[in-house]
Amino acid sequence: MDELTAQALKAFTRRYCGAWQEKHGSWPLSEELYGVPSPCIISSTRDAVYWQPQPFEGEENVNAVERAFDIVVQPALHAFYTTQFAGDMPAQFADEKLTLLQTWSQDDFRRVQENLIGHLVTQKRLRLSPTLFIATQENELEVISICNLSGEVIKETLGTRHRIVLAATLAEFLTQLNPLL
């Protein structure tokens, strides 16, 4: 596992949970994840769940993605999706507002791998170099991804060659993220 990425992700998650605690006096709250089972849930309201990150349980890799395309996925991406279970976290990187994606449970981890495979299928069909998403943005056509060739974190417009490098590594990107509440 890419330890620098794992450490940077845990550090950002601590910053996010700490900022939430400071602002709201509780663990993060999510309406979107209400009713979806997870080891992260610590309590529920009528229509939301309070959550805290939990250690990832299971095989710590995204080998299903590698097998589907006979490729080697950047080690940072393995670490990103298998360090912890947590809720998605809104954040800001420089001027870019985003939602950092996380796996909520083992079932969600399987779904994320299926979505990554679908993303790669589309890229292959359009003859684009492979990227693997890690965050969404308000504009549904823009995502934050890892370039699987270079390991750089990029902002890309889906279905196009339009890509902007944001950071040289995922660990660097995560270190510079700020929680957005």
UniProtKB/Swiss-Prot annotation:
Membrane topology classification:
Peripheral membrane protein
Family as reported in the entry's similarity comment: Belongs to the Syd family.
Keywords for the protein's UniProt record, in alphabetical order? Cell inner membrane, Cell membrane, Membrane
User: Cell membrane: present as a keyword of the record?
Assistant: yes
Q: Which NCBIfam families match?
A: PRK04968.1
Function in brief: Interacts with the SecY protein in vivo. May bind preferentially to an uncomplexed state of SecY, thus functioning either as a chelating agent for excess SecY in the cell or as a regulatory factor that negatively controls the translocase function.
Its cellular-component GO annotations read: cytoplasmic side of plasma membrane
Q: Where in the cell is it found?
A: Cell inner membrane
**Highest taxon of the lineage:** Bacteria
Its name, as the record gives it, is Protein Syd
Main location per the UniProt record: membrane
Q: Does the entry feature the keyword DNA-binding, yes or no?
A: no
